[in-house]
Structure formats: C-alpha cells, structure tokens
Amino acid sequence: LVREMKEELEEKLGTELLYAAAAIPPGTDALDGGAIKNVVQGAGFEITALLDEPTAANQILKIQNGAVVDIGGGTTGISILENGKVINVDDEATGGTHFSLVLAGAYKLPFSEAEIYKRDKKNHKEILPVLKPVIEKVASIISRQIEGYNVQGLYLVGGTCCLSGIEDIIGKKTGIPTYKPEN
C-alpha cells in the first residue's frame, strides 16, 4: 500500500522520491520503531529520521519554548522544548478514540458513527459539553507531564485538536495559554 502511494505521488510529481522520515508515538521506539522503519524501507525509501510525533510536529511549528501536545487517535504525546531543544517527551493513553467512545455512549451510536459525528464541525458546539470531562483528563495529563518545567505555552497538534473549543478548556484547566493551528 505504501509503495503504491509512493509510486502514485512520484508519477504526479514527475520525480523519484528517495528519502523519508517517519514519526511514532513517544516512548514506543522499541515497539514501533522497527516496524515503521521496515514499512518505510519496504516502500523504497531510505529513512532519514525516526522521530516521536510531537517532536516531528515541532519541525514545522518551530516552537522555541513551551510544550507541543499531540492529541492523537489513542494517545496524548507531549514534547517539552527549551531554546528549541526537546528536553522531555512523554505519551499517555487518552486521545480521540476515547472522545468517540464517550459520544457513542452518550448518543447511543455505533463507534464508527460517533467518530464521523465528532469530526463534523457543525456538531462541535453541541458535543463540547459532553466531551468536557475527557478534555479535562487530557489537560490533567498535560499538567502532570509538564510539572517541574517552565512551560509558558501549549501548542496543540493532532487530529483531536480540530475539535472547536478544546484549546479553551485545556487552557483554563492548566492555567497556561493554549494555541492550536487553524483547521
């Protein structure tokens, strides 16, 4: 599948793609690192870097001081940065899947429908109060992981941060200014 995607992209671009970097959840290198490397190399790439996901996101964001918080499908990964350098990375099992499970229970929907409902921006205002306890759990994870560090700003990334208003709840609960990219 990845090789087919690579070939399709090469055809569209009119050039051969030789190099690739990949990202994995923090702390999973021993479990996921080898598998991801095999997939990337199996597709015909030379792997140039294997980074944890929040650190990879910061390659684009260029945050100098603060924490990049990757609220993904199953986990929340946090990279703490000081002077542009990662000084701590951690990951905990709470993410978008948990949001979907709460919605499935609250609205008596199959998980797959709850997932679609969650992603539809027109539903965000309605579902935010239902999801607030899970968002506050994410905020408590963040607070615990950044304890003892001088974090002046939180920068949200990952699919789950597309939920309208999530940054306000996290900012209020942590007491730290919280930002997310335009979605």
Regions found by a protein language model. Name each.
Residues L1-I71, N83-E92, G96-N183:
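Nucleotide/phosphate-binding catalytic cleft detector across ATP-hydrolyzing
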Residues T76-I80:
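Short beta-strand scaffold segments in enzyme catalytic cores
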